[in-house]
Amino acid sequence: MGSDTIADIITSIRNADMYRKSVVRVASTNISQSIVKILLREGFIENVRKHRENNKSFLVLTLRHRRNRKRTYRNLLNLKRISRPGLRIYSNYQRIPRILGGMGIVILSTSQGIMTDREARLERIGGEILCYIW
């Protein structure tokens, strides 16, 4: 775990999906809870539960996988960190990119909290582009 909690969450989920793990454990922070809530609402993960161990809180995520698949495995989740500590990327609501023509989502940090691109366009507010998920 480094100092960039968003990158840690994205990397943990991406690695677990790549190796077909069904459960991921990430550190519980306000930002991670907001991002996980969006992933759960959009259907990218199945379940979330809180776990406490040695006075540290964790979120235990259950990933969504295709079961009984015989062919080669393709990742179901594609996550990409955009704005990072060394290079912040901001966008107004008109220039928020559309991922796969609206099939994917963009997670933004706005003055109203962390939200998806669709919510930001409806609210007509921009913000920092945290990551793409498709």
UniProtKB/Swiss-Prot annotation:
Its main location: plastid. Signal peptide: none annotated. It comes from the Eukaryota. The keyword Plastid applies. Gene3D superfamilies: 3.30.1370.30, 3.30.1490.10. The keyword Ribosomal protein applies. Belongs to the universal ribosomal protein uS8 family. HAMAP family: Ribosomal_uS8_B (MF_01302_B). One of the primary rRNA binding proteins, it binds directly to 16S rRNA central domain where it helps coordinate assembly of the platform of the 30S subunit. This is Small ribosomal subunit protein uS8c.
